[in-house]
UniProtKB/Swiss-Prot annotation:
Compartment list: Periplasm
Species, as recorded: Synechococcus elongatus (strain ATCC 33912 / PCC 7942 / FACHB-805) (Anacystis nidulans R2)
Gene disruption: observed consequences: No significant differences in the growth kinetics of cells grown in medium containing high or low concentrations of sulfate.
Classification of source organism: Bacteria, Bacillati, Cyanobacteriota, Cyanophyceae, Synechococcales
Signal peptide region: 1-31
Family the UniProt entry places it in: Belongs to the catalase family.
GO annotations of cellular component type: cytoplasm; periplasmic space
Protein name per UniProt: Catalase-related peroxidase
SUPFAM superfamilies membership: Heme-dependent catalase-like
Annotated GO biological process: hydrogen peroxide catabolic process; hydrogen peroxide metabolic process; response to hydrogen peroxide
Amino acid sequence: MIRIRNRWFRWLAIALASLVASIGIATVGFAATGVTPDQVLSAIEGTFGVNVGQRRNHIKGTCAVGNFVATTEAKTYSRSPLFSGQSIPVVARFSLAGGNPKAPDTAKNPRGLGLQFQLPNNRFLNMALLNTPVFGVASPEGFYENILAIRPDPTTGKPDPEKVKAFREKYPENKAQAAFLASNNPPTSYANTSYFGLHAFKFINQTNQTRLVRWQFVPQDGEKRLTDAELQAAPANFLEQKLIERTQDSPVKWDFWITLGQPGDAEDNPTIAWPSDRQQVKVGTLTLTAASPQPGAACEGINYDPLVLSDGIEPTNDPVLQFRSGVYALSYSKRTRGL
């Protein structure tokens, strides 16, 4: 990992990272919204507090490293260098959703996975995934109001039930993700759950044929969830150590699958699942060989902006996807300046 020691170069790196996060490598620009990245980040800070020099959301995390190798079939759908068939180095970060660094690993909230693929010629491709098949809101405004709704009341220390109810009524698209989390206990390990890209993207191949896709990583170790008894007995912190021990035993792997969209499938709404009969294609395998606590490790300084893409992969106009880049850049700028 390259460490930036000179202060001037550090500021330059922050500025460049913010620029890249804003435009990506294959971005179509920001969608017009009624909220700004600064408002959303301020809302997150107001709800969870500020942990100086750390991420504002998905703050509790674990680093891992490994590689990705594409299948030969992947090139049929995308000309991205990710699908060259060569071994692509990967820096991964597993996390719990939210801004509480002491959140228990038994919490019924999403688990996140950030992936940075280190492509040839000093280029990168990022992915930001959750272990829920759909997202909770369809707009930046919905995300902003959700963060405000779950803010603890100063008197009770818990979210105001009336505000939560009002949010759910205003944004009924939240029901699908909420139902998934309520009916599925957390995974036994970061290695025992699928991770979904949530948004739709465009794959472009060598003949400029474009296909709408969604993607997910399916664990070769299988899906395993805590039983109710295990959930009650589990310690507050177990996910990191289990992942470290699992990678020490042998490499842990996920198969990378794309789902091919058809006309009429939701292109710009991550709260709507595509029909289950859509064709799926395996396009590669992610292998992680080592995991470690986050402080000082490779993933700590990475901004996993999902709009940092490559030739052959383009974003859609999904307003949530388009909005994330600005919030990620602002959060990255703050934490790397020790704020």
